[in-house]
């Protein structure tokens, strides 16, 4: 018989820097998961992505074992790095925080494709463009 999933925990952690301190410790500890085992496995899988925030989905099973799936970095982080800014505009309707090209937008959309609910790259580009617009990032041809 397959193991029963008792909880799915979603966290966003810095790549290669997971440690037992909050938010990891309390989130996993209350389900009886071996926190250090998760931290070592997560850090090993994400050491090549240093500097990014990586969303992770942890499935905890009834026997206290776990599996986890790494997602792509949040669109806002990808956009900030692409535009070379530290934060989005305070008022995105009036301010322009940065600029990216359509080619860069397509590249970001292709990166995010596995995690987006989009059937084509064009649809994914529209989703990422909406995120860019809300952050005050202008898209140029």
From Swiss-Prot:
The record's SMART domains line, in alphabetical order, gives: RL11
Q: Is Membrane a UniProt keyword of this protein?
A: no
Q: Name one GO molecular function term.
A: structural constituent of ribosome
Biological process annotations from GO? translation
Q: Does the keyword rRNA-binding apply?
A: yes
Q: Which Pfam families does this chain map to?
A: Ribosomal_L11, Ribosomal_L11_N
Which superkingdom does the taxonomy of this entry point to?
Answer: Bacteria
* PROSITE patterns associated with the record: RIBOSOMAL_L11 (PS00359)
Quaternary assembly: Part of the ribosomal stalk of the 50S ribosomal subunit. Interacts with L10 and the large rRNA to form the base of the stalk. L10 forms an elongated spine to which L12 dimers bind in a sequential fashion forming a multimeric L10(L12)X complex.
The molecule here is called Large ribosomal subunit protein uL11
Please name the source species. Fusobacterium nucleatum subsp. nucleatum (strain ATCC 25586 / DSM 15643 / BCRC 10681 / CIP 101130 / JCM 8532 / KCTC 2640 / LMG 13131 / VPI 4355)
């Amino acid at each position: 018989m397959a193991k029963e999933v008792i909880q799915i925990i979603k966290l966003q952690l810095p790549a290669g820097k997971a440690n037992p301190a909050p938010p990891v410790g309390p989130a996993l500890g209350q389900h009886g998961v071996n926190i250090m085992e998760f931290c070592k496995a997560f850090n090993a899988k994400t050491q090549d992505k240093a500097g990014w925030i990586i969303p992770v989905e942890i499935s905890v099973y009834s026997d206290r074992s776990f599996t986890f799936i790494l997602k792509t970095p949040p669109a806002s982080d990808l956009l900030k790095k692409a535009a070379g800014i530290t934060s989005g505009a305070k008022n995105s309707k009036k301010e322009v925080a940065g600029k990216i090209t359509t080619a860069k937008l397509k590249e970001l959309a292709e990166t995010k494709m596995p995690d987006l609910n989009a059937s084509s790259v064009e649809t994914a580009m529209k989703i990422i463009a909406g995120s860019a617009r809300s952050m005050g990032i202008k898209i140029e041809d």
